[in-house]
């Protein structure tokens, strides 16, 4: 079995994992209502002995070693408050996963009528990886259509046009600060924000911080109910997530995710809300990069990290 092989390969790895947090437990609001912003439970070691390391840490460390990467994972069961946290407070490039949060901010800022406003742009505005916007230079696109393109197709030009409606990267950064996120640093637009270099803090966040932001928009009370449903629909119908978190969850679980891919260092991300038929949703963020500029990352890594989370929280 896959997980047995991983565990056996890392019996000696646990002692080296002093940075890995432990599981936490807490109580949440009713499943019938949106969660208040900022209601996510924080990690706690109260139920564990000092220095005790969770078994899942060895499995995630094994994946780091097998794929020769740096891996960050944060997941929370929004019903029980239990967490899986591995390098969850360390910085990683967020790449295109920000587009889910950007569209949450756009929905929050604009009325339904404003979301139907057509945005005009020219060929000069087009950047790489713009499969939807490149087809609508003549007629333009509504804010709703731009969000659909940004979240479901990771369209870079759509993301840049949406940036203009929320005050640019700095404006979105300030919006996230309003959610309690004082970690994320947003500075550049596409495609430059995906060109991360080791040691840089520009356009980075932590697995925990970005997951909490996604939770606030999708499950919290930041957005009106109709806007939450719209963002959820975009995420659930994402076209770029096959082989990532979707490939690692259990049968019957429904995933709404946003992926990200960096230009260098094999940087790869997937961030999701996962709805289970027999429990409250999970919120999961996996962030990865390699150690060399030309590194290539196999998407299997994110799927297998998701399997570890599913085993622990499922």
From Swiss-Prot:
Recorded superkingdom: Bacteria
Regions of compositional bias (Low complexity) in chain numbering: 32-47
InterPro entries in the record: Beta-lactam/transpept-like, Beta-lactam_cat, Beta-lactam_class-A, Beta-lactam_class-A_AS
GO molecular function: beta-lactamase activity
Record keyword Signal present: yes
GO biological process: beta-lactam antibiotic catabolic process; response to antibiotic
Residues bound to substrate: 258-260
Keyword Hydrolase assigned: yes
Active site per UniProt: 96 (acyl-ester intermediate)
Known catalytic reactions: a beta-lactam + H2O = a substituted beta-amino acid
UniProt keywords, alphabetically: Antibiotic resistance, Hydrolase, Signal
Segment forming the signal sequence: 1-26
Region (Disordered): 32-51
Enzyme Commission number(s) from the entry: 3.5.2.6
PROSITE patterns, alphabetized: BETA_LACTAMASE_A
UniProt cross-references to Pfam families, sorted A to Z: Beta-lactamase2
Membership in a protein family: Belongs to the class-A beta-lactamase family.
PANTHER family reported in the protein's UniProt record: BETA-LACTAMASE, BETA-LACTAMASE-TYPE TRANSPEPTIDASE FOLD CONTAINING PROTEIN
Anything else known: The class A beta-lactamase family has a specific amino-acid numbering system, sometimes called Ambler or ABL numbering and often misspelt as Amber. A multiple sequence alignment was used to derive a consensus sequence and then the consensus was numbered taking into account insertions and deletions. This allows use of identical numbers, e.g. for active site residues, despite differences in protein length. UniProt always uses natural numbering of residues, hence there appear to be differences in numbering between this entry and some papers.
Protein name in UniProt: Beta-lactamase 2
Organism: Streptomyces cacaoi
Top-level taxonomy: Bacteria, Bacillati, Actinomycetota, Actinomycetes, Kitasatosporales
Gene responsible for this protein: blaU
């Amino acid at each position: 079995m896959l997980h047995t092989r991983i565990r056996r390969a890392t019996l000696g790895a646990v002692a080296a994992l002093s940075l890995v947090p432990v599981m936490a437990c807490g109580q949440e609001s009713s499943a019938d209502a949106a969660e208040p912003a900022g209601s996510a439970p924080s990690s706690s070691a109260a139920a564990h002995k000092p220095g005790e390391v969770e078994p899942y840490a060895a499995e995630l460390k094994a994946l780091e070693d097998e794929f020769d990467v740096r891996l960050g994972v944060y997941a929370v069961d929004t019903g029980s408050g239990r967490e899986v946290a591995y390098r969850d407070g360390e910085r990683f490039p967020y790449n295109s996963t920000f587009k889910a949060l950007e569209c949450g901010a756009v929905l929050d800022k604009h009325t339904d009528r404003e979301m139907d406003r057509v945005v005009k742009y020219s060929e000069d505005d087009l950047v790489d990886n713009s499969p939807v916007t490149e087809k609508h230079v003549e007629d333009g696109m509504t804010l709703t259509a731009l969000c659909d393109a940004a979240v479901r197709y990771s369209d870079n030009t759509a993301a840049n046009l949406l940036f203009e409606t929320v005050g640019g990267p700095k404006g979105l950064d300030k919006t996230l600060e309003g959610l309690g996120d004082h970690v994320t640093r947003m500075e550049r637009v596409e495609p430059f924000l995906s060109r991360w270099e080791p040691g840089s803090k520009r356009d980075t966040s932590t697995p925990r911080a970005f997951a909490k932001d996604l939770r606030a928009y999708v499950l919290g009370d930041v957005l009106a109910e109709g806007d939450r449903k719209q963002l959820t629909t975009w995420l659930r119908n994402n076209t770029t997530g096959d082989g990532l978190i979707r490939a690692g969850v259990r049968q019957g679980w429904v995933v709404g995710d946003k992926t990200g891919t960096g230009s260098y260092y094999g940087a790869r991300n997937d961030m999701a809300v996962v709805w289970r038929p027999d429990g409250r949703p999970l919120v999961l963020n996996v962030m990865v990069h390699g150690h060399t500029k030309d590194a290539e990352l196999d998407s299997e890594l994110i799927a297998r990290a998701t399997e570890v989370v599913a085993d622990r929280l499922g």
